[in-house]
């Protein structure tokens, strides 16, 4: 048994404009090469674009998109007796949120469009409506977990 005390969980900081932790989580995933101001600019312009297009609260659209994409289960590779099984495991809400943000940004990067602002805003609006590549990724993960339910006892 370890003698060290358990590390305290870091609380996520909130962003300067909306004072929202979720926005900060998305910004930190957009971030490339330490250019945080650029990441903030991309997300804030995408949020402004969502507000112009939908005339709804853009943060509620962001929240709904992340909620729709968040998976309940995922599959992990587990090696048993020389063969590898994809074992379905439940995931916590924070890990699910992280996966959802990662999938949303990955889907928006693959999208065709002018720039990241438009691609991200359209992907978020699609996910909030219930379609888009990020939603497809979640459904694919759930299908994989359902197909490998027989291996759930290997957890």
Swiss-Prot record:
Pfam family, one: Ribosomal_S7
One of the record's GO cellular component terms: small ribosomal subunit
Gene Ontology molecular functions: rRNA binding; structural constituent of ribosome
Record key words, sorted: Chloroplast, Plastid, Ribonucleoprotein, Ribosomal protein, RNA-binding, rRNA-binding
InterPro entries, per database record: Ribosomal_uS7, Ribosomal_uS7_bac/org-type, Ribosomal_uS7_CS, Ribosomal_uS7_dom, Ribosomal_uS7_dom_sf
Subcellular location per the Swiss-Prot or TrEMBL entry: Plastid, Chloroplast
Family: Belongs to the universal ribosomal protein uS7 family.
Quaternary data: Part of the 30S ribosomal subunit.
Protein name: Small ribosomal subunit protein uS7c
